[in-house]
């Protein structure tokens, strides 16, 4: 009698799955309940961002970057603004730098609190997301009070930030910090020592440091494996070199360590925010928030009422844009998900010749097969939750 060959069982995970974080589709090959192979299918949210930017002026390109990692929009704008500023050879005034750093850290907390709480939800804890969204809502309001929009802010522009922050807003951000740290401690007590949470995350999805570098990981994925690599310290931009903060690192490189790193990073972000708030209310309470070059930054409304030149500058800036000297530059920021880079090529015209976006989630997703092989089916969601993937930036 001929023996029947046993073949593996294939299932589709997503793109409608609640734990798939957007439009992810994984084709899983299972041997019983053990994962043999993971094949991620991407491109379901592809919008051609890089190509669209080539048809827009440098100022009009900014809103596209909000729509990449939409959990922390301003961090993406930051990389693009830095790249354009390096090509233009302009500096951002100190107050503008502080506002940028403040809002980048707000974005980091927004992203991490969403990730940590939904990671807990993926493994069965329903309370954390409800707590996390309470704090996240307050941060969304700070976004709205600065830029007028809760998510797609378009607030960081090449040359600085769009508008100054009212003093009351800076004071309110300062008042928010201590209650937030208390709620992080509550979350910590709920999850960190929780037996079920630990059983689902400890020793799952282990990445050694050598593997992390080889796969092109960055951000929490590298720090969870024990490397204190953070662009805010290793390649400081804006005024991060003047800020006092620590880089948390993990020991084992598993899902649990990555969770712990994110929890501590939120506390460090709050620490940076407090320093920014103190400076913005004290030494740097007045001054310009963007470069004073009228060719790059629009004039104030009052100046437009008085001066014909200001009106012309404003009109030219929003219709034609400014010409950027020919050249190429790579600017990277430590976004919440990892190293977000913008490689900008200018041919001397008012539009970018090429804008390559280096999304951290892309490198992390490609390792799903490597991370999940040999684990059980239920561990796929735990690994995916700890990678912190957002499809806006993966598919671009």
Swiss-Prot record:
| Organism field | Mesorhizobium japonicum (strain LMG 29417 / CECT 9101 / MAFF 303099)
> Keyword set for this entry?
Cell inner membrane, Cell membrane, Membrane, NAD, Quinone, Translocase, Transport, Ubiquinone
Q: Write down the EC number.
A: 7.1.1.-
GO MF annotation, one: NADH:ubiquinone reductase (non-electrogenic) activity
Q: Which PANTHER family match?
A: NADH DEHYDROGENASE [UBIQUINONE] IRON-SULFUR PROTEIN 2, MITOCHONDRIAL, NADH-UBIQUINONE OXIDOREDUCTASE 49 KDA SUBUNIT
Task: Quote the catalytic activity from the record.
Answer: a quinone + NADH + 5 H(+)(in) = a quinol + NAD(+) + 4 H(+)(out)
Family that this chain belongs to: Belongs to the complex I 49 kDa subunit family.
Membrane topology, record value: Peripheral membrane protein
Offer a single GO CC term for the protein: plasma membrane
Domain of life from the UniProt record? Bacteria
Name recorded for this polypeptide? NADH-quinone oxidoreductase subunit D
Q: Which gene encodes it?
A: nuoD
Localisation: Cell inner membrane
